């Protein structure tokens, strides 16, 4: 899938991302990576909710690409043949046929629940990514904050909130401690696998959301 570049992840975009996740500010008129003229231009048609979510996901994907670039440049993890060893120790969310997000057997309600649940499950892994980058610290934070905003938008779209599973805080805390206690090689590999899996999950989510 070709990601469309939307905006550079600079300090301004990062600060905007932080503002958007404040409860008092939600829903905000402008999403990260979104120009205010896209929302309220006097002589143009404002973006629909679906279009804004689409653009927001592509913004996050751009951030993931920047983080993966740094990861690949500083290590050989992107080419490693030992990925399976580390991947077996992770429980990263993935799309399956039963989730109703694929073209065959598509089910909007079931799929939306899966997307939201998956994003909630990814949050602990996005927390792990914080402080894992030297030159892209703001990008890592922006991806994390923008994902929180995306979850809030999708929850407003969902009809069956009771079906959404939220990870237990104690479970997440235990997992985070375990991941941070790994040796350097495994931490680098975990970072690579999280970014790759999150990219794949968002791409699948984007394709599914375009059918809704």
From Swiss-Prot:
PROSITE patterns: INTERLEUKIN_6. Keywords: Acute phase, Cytokine, Disulfide bond, Glycoprotein, Growth factor, Phosphoprotein, Secreted, Signal. It is found in: Secreted. Glycans are attached at residues 73, 172. SUPFAM superfamilies: 4-helical cytokines. The keyword Iron-sulfur does not apply. Component of a hexamer of two molecules each of IL6, IL6R and IL6ST; first binds to IL6R to associate with the signaling subunit IL6ST. Interacts with IL6R (via the N-terminal ectodomain); this interaction may be affected by IL6R-binding with SORL1, hence decreasing IL6 cis signaling. Interacts with SORL1 (via the N-terminal ectodomain); this interaction leads to IL6 internalization and lysosomal degradation. May form a trimeric complex with the soluble SORL1 ectodomain and soluble IL6R receptor; this interaction might stabilize circulating IL6, hence promoting IL6 trans signaling. Belongs to the IL-6 superfamily. This is Interleukin-6. It comes from Macaca fascicularis.
């Amino acid at each position: 899938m070709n990601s469309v570049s939307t905006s550079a992840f600079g300090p301004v975009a990062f600060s905007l991302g932080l503002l958007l996740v404040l409860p008092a500010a939600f829903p905000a008129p402008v999403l990260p990576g979104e120009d205010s003229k896209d929302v309220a231009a006097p002589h143009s048609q404002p973006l629909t909710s679906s279009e804004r979510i689409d653009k927001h996901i592509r913004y996050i994907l751009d951030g993931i690409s920047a983080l993966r670039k740094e990861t690949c440049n500083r290590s050989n993890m992107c080419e490693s043949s030992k990925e399976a060893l580390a991947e077996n120790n992770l429980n990263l969310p993935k799309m399956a046929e039963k989730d109703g997000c694929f073209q065959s057997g598509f089910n909007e309600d079931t799929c939306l629940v899966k997307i939201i649940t998956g994003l909630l499950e990814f949050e602990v892994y996005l927390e792990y990514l914080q402080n894992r980058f030297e030159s892209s610290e703001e990008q890592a934070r922006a991806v994390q904050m923008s994902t929180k905003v995306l979850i809030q938008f999708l929850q407003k779209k969902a009809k069956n909130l009771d079906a959404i599973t939220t990870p237990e805080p104690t479970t997440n805390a235990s997992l985070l401690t375990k991941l941070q206690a790994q040796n350097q090689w495994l931490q680098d590999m975990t970072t690579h696998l999280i970014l790759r899996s999150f990219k794949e999950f968002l791409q699948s989510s984007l394709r599914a959301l375009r059918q809704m």
